[in-house]
Amino acid sequence: MNDIVRIGPGQTQQSTTKFVGISVDERERERALRERFAIFWEAVSGEPRAHYDEFISASPLVGDVDLEAVDADRVRGWWVRPRHPKPGQAILFLHGGGYVLGSAKAYRGFVSQIVSRAGIPALVVDYPLASEATLPAAPDAAKAAWRWLVAQGFDRIAVVGDSAGGGLSLVTLAELIREPVGAAPTAGVVFSPWTDLAFTGASMKDLTVADPLIGYEYLQDCARKYLGAADPHDPLASPLFGDLRGLPPLLIQVGTDERLLDDARRYADLATLAGVSVELEIFEGMHHVFQLDVAHLETSRAALDSAAQFLRNAFDGR
């Protein structure tokens, strides 16, 4: 479905919303995957960060990328590079985990799936986690990574992230429009972004939402740890409440079975009204950040193919 939204006198902006259905076989694969999720998390005890990294690391590392650790100028993380990258192009990837979990190392496999498809190198950043570090530590780290990429000579950079990292990606893009560093961002791609830490979306509290991975109470706890004394309506925490004018082209992907469904839909609507080119893809029956499950779901592979094509088009100026 293509909607033309009028922004002002003489101006129009196209917003594309695509609903992707799934087959009966894919629905069964999703059901089996949810059973495996339940078994994994029921067996978890001890340090949650180690278990989360184990869970994320199940996304397979592709064979045609190179890995390199980064620890320089306040920037820590990993390079995930294709064998033949184009000069000057890069992805800044910000991982999920509710701002309390996750690491660049654990996300290398997932990011390799994007890099291999798009042919664009990605810097996967380790940013400070809560509750040890609160807002604005994560946005500051993301902007430091952007500055580092610019200093390394990259002049075509997209920002990509999932879940909390998706929200952080949108925060980072808005900050870079407000205070530019180098060339303007090329594009943004976010998977199941957490855009509203004030929890005003209907799907967040909807008891009929069958999200197998994240619950309302869990996200509330993550938000408390991350916000510290900050207002949840602060755009540095919740990009939904920020100034969205001037953002680069955006691709937003989300599943129907998500607490964060309305976080994605409302952000897409507001960005479109602000004059941003937005592609929103909603996937039937899919759980939170289903793209990670590329080894199990055809829908995950199709979503990553779409994201890679979006990035290539943005970098090629199409």
For every predicted segment, state its role.
Residues 39, 62, 66-318:
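Alpha/beta-hydrolase superfamily serine-hydrolase fold, recognizing
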Residues 1-83, 316-318:
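A glycine/proline-hinged amphipathic helix-loop "lid/cap" segment
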